């Protein structure tokens, strides 16, 4: 190629590139002008387009045009603004037996995996589903710090929660608050959790709401300020919580504290016939909250607190039925007592328990053994709340008497798509010390069941771990 041809070739190439660049520039200018006017057509350029994707999430797309660049940002936002406070208007569902809901097998799994040492477990639900809760000991079953976890109170305990059905581990547990006594409940908008911590003679409570500490409560009697060890219940934003401070074997100071969004609305001293209150198991229906508690001082029959959350008032009495449900307890008497404790039982002064009191649809839970925390059974006892002669008409074994049980408590999925509130309960399956002293730890697994209108058979849902494998 001679020099003239080279010049012509280079010139043609340059002109071609110039034309292409010009066309690209024109296209870019047109695109930016078009986008500018498209955004400008809306009344407010900062107003996002909202596209609902499901009942719990919203996708927000923000279109912002600056300096001829268009940025599109996708934000996933929980639709808390569309939630409303839980309203306890429904009745309890009819229950003829109990079906299995969940079993975490924590001790069996912990023989090999990293599973937290826990006790005082419970379940609590929210609009998204149900979670398991427990007070962690800040160590695992195979950890050396598991030695001494038989003790209830230490600076290392925390209320943790995890997905229902899983075993609690350092990898799936969420810390709700720090302490050695707890309760937690959801009001339909956000969760309130309360933890007690500190020394026996000067403990305090910290109230969390929406993931932040909101209120602190000091000890009022200087003797182990403590609370329910299972879920509280809310109605129209008001969440009553039962707390006790004082002796475990004598008259103590119990208060019902009414919270809204973690802030105290009212405090009531315990009134009525109940003489000692600890570890209440509460549920709600028909705009009333009922708490079935533990009389650790005198009664083998359980005290009952009935709360009107709208009026923020309460009354207390004892479960009238002759079927005694605390442990330890004497043999069932000929007559119950609505107004006073029925004494007797040896050696343990009591255990956390529950009942669902709904006229003919009433159910009581108790250990099968009257002397120790072994076995567990559910008894349908019509009118147990009001009739001193009431006895069982239906019986279902939950844990056979050859296996350990422990605390038990009530919970309900108040957001389930039903015409009624279906009663549910859990049983703590304690393993390790003091009954099994060949290991250094004390921990538990959990089994949970819910009501069924069908008549289902019994089975033993015991823990099932072989302690010999931990040696």
Swiss-Prot record:
On modification after translation, the UniProt record reads: N-glycosylated.
Q: How does it sit in the membrane?
A: Single-pass type II membrane protein
Q: Where is this region: Head of neuraminidase?
A: 92-471
| Cysteine pairs bridged by disulfides in the record | 93-420, 125-130, 185-232, 234-239, 280-293, 282-291, 320-338, 424-450
Sugar-modified residues: 51, 54, 63, 68, 71, 87, 147, 202, 403
UniProt keyword Nucleotide-binding present: no
Additional observations = The influenza A genome consist of 8 RNA segments. Genetic variation of hemagglutinin and/or neuraminidase genes results in the emergence of new influenza strains. The mechanism of variation can be the result of point mutations or the result of genetic reassortment between segments of two different strains.
Q: How is its activity regulated?
A: Inhibited by the neuraminidase inhibitors zanamivir (Relenza) and oseltamivir (Tamiflu). These drugs interfere with the release of progeny virus from infected cells and are effective against all influenza strains. Resistance to neuraminidase inhibitors is quite rare.
Q: Does the keyword Transmembrane apply?
A: yes
The identity of this protein, by name, is Neuraminidase
List ligand-binding residues for Ca(2+). 295, 299, 326
- Which Gene3D superfamilies does the record match to this protein? 2.120.10.10
Region (Hypervariable stalk region): which ranges?
Answer: 36-89
Q: What are the annotated GO cellular component locations?
A: host cell plasma membrane; membrane; virion membrane
What assembly does the database describe for this protein? Homotetramer.
The role this protein plays is:
Catalyzes the removal of terminal sialic acid residues from viral and cellular glycoconjugates. Cleaves off the terminal sialic acids on the glycosylated HA during virus budding to facilitate virus release. Additionally helps virus spread through the circulation by further removing sialic acids from the cell surface. These cleavages prevent self-aggregation and ensure the efficient spread of the progeny virus from cell to cell. Otherwise, infection would be limited to one round of replication.
Which EC class is this protein assigned? hydrolase
Q: Which InterPro entries match?
A: Glyco_hydro_34 (IPR001860), Sialidase_sf (IPR036278)
Q: On the Intravirion side, which residues?
A: 1-6
Which cofactors, if any, are listed as required? Ca(2+)
Source species of the chain: Influenza A virus (strain A/Gull/Maryland/704/1977 H13N6)
Where does the protein principally reside?
Answer: virion
């Amino acid at each position: 190629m001679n020099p003239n041809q080279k010049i012509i070739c280079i010139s043609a190439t340059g002109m071609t590139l110039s034309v292409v660049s010009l066309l690209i520039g024109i296209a870019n200018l047109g695109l930016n002008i078009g986008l500018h006017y498209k955004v400008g057509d809306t009344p407010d350029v900062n107003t996002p387009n909202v596209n609902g994707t499901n009942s719990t999430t919203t996708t927000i797309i923000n279109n912002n045009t600056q300096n001829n660049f268009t940025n599109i940002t996708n934000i996933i936002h929980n639709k808390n603004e569309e939630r409303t406070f839980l309203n306890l208007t429904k009745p309890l569902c009819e229950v003829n037996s109990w079906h299995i809901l969940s079993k975490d097998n924590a001790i069996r799994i912990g023989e090999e995996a990293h599973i937290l040492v826990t006790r005082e477990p419970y379940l609590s639900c929210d609009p998204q589903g149900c979670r398991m809760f427990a007070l962690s000991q800040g160590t695992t079953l195979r950890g050396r710090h598991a030695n001494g976890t038989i003790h209830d109170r230490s600076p290392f305990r925390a209320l943790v929660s995890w997905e229902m059905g899983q075993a609690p581990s350092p990898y799936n547990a969420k810390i709700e608050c720090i302490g050695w006594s707890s309760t937690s409940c959801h009001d339909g908008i956000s969760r309130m959790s309360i933890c007690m911590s500190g020394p026996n003679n000067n403990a305090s409570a910290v109230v969390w709401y929406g993931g932040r500490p909101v209120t602190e409560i000091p000890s009022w009697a200087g003797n182990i300020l403590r609370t329910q060890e299972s879920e509280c219940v809310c109605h129209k934003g008001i969440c009553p919580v039962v707390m006790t401070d004082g002796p475990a074997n004598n008259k103590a100071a119990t208060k019902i504290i009414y919270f809204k969004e973690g802030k105290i609305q009212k405090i009531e001293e315990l009134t009525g016939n109940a003489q000692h209150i600890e570890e209440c198991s509460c549920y709600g229906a028909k705009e009333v909250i009922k708490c079935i508690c533990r009389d650790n001082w005198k009664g083998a029959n359980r005290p009952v607190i009935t709360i009107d959350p709208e009026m923020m008032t309460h009354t207390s009495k004892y479960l009238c039925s002759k079927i005694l449900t605390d442990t330890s307890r004497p043999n069932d008497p000929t007559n119950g007592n609505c107004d006073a404790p029925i004494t007797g039982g040896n050696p343990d002064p009591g255990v956390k328990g529950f009942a669902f009191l709904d006229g003919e649809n009433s159910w009581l839970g108790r250990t099968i053994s009257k002397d120790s925390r072994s076995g567990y059974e559910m008894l349908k006892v019509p009118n147990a709340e009001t009739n001193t002669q009431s006895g069982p008409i239906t019986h279902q074994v939950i844990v056979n008497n050859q296996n350990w049980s422990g605390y038990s408590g009530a919970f309900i999925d108040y957001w389930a798509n039903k015409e009624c509130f279906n009663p549910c309960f859990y049983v703590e399956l304690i393993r390790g010390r003091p009954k099994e002293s060949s290991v250094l730890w004390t921990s538990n697994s959990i089994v949970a069941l819910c009501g069924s209108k069908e008549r289902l058979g019994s089975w033993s849902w015991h823990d099932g771990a072989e302690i010999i494998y931990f040696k």
